[in-house]
Amino acid sequence: GSRFSERVTGDRNRYVGKKTIIQLDIDPSEVDKNVMTALPLVGDMKENLTKLSERVQKLEIEHWWHTIRAWDATENRSAQSGDRLTAPWLMKELTRSFKGEDTVFVTDVGQNQMWAALHLEVDAPRHHLTSGGCGTMGFGVPAALGAKISRPEAQVVQICGDGGFKMTGMEMYTALRESAPFITVVINNSCLGMVRQWQQVFYDKRYSSTILTPFNFVGFAKACGADGATVTTCAEFTAALAKARKQGKNFLIEA
């Protein structure tokens, strides 16, 4: 089902290397389109995976998990950088603040989605809503609205970038109208971060249509009947999050 796009593989030559690639897809036109495979299996995923698993030996991967946990511990330490607000720290703070609670996290699309996937810890199934690799910028706000209407007893926290919020942010008014409050965290880097990153890595920093003009996110939220705060430090973020939880209404934090 993977298209082996550059957002999945990065540098395809380095990604492929000496690997033996088996591609499973329902669509034959996707086979060998981006990466040459040793064994293409076209058809129903469940049927093909069942047959494939019968021929694959079970691997002992405990040592690999130890390596991953060591990386995670290193990343956790690097995320602590005084009072300077970083995306990894922000995700860890959200995890800490809502630990053990019935909280549904919703991510938009872009670097915010990647940071959440790496550093946000979710305790239960169906408590992390994401559009995966579909690239649906603007998914966050309406998805959070739907989650809150579906499960009004749960706390809903929506994480997005400045680009994604600008696409569907007006739904905050719908949330007001429907009495469906949730917390929105906008990670604002004043650009379409993931596209800009690819322009930097693959296109010799030839930036095009990725730098965004300033926008008053908190003012916009207040115009939609919500409250909000702009934060630049860890302490400010923690205080704003506590205020958002106490108020129990739509609240936007621009970080």
What is the role of each PLM region?
Residues 1-67:
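Glycine-rich, acidic loop regions that bind phosphate or pyrophosphate groups
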Residues 23, 106, 159-160:
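Generic enzyme active-site microenvironment
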Residues 68-153:
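Active-site diphosphate/adenylate-binding microenvironment
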Residues 17-18, 99-101, 247-248:
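Short, well-ordered loop/turn elements at secondary-structure boundaries
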Residues 13-15, 31-42, 46-52, 114-255:
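Thiamine diphosphate
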Residues 3-5, 84-88, 164-167:
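Active-site glycine- and acidic-residue-rich loops that bind
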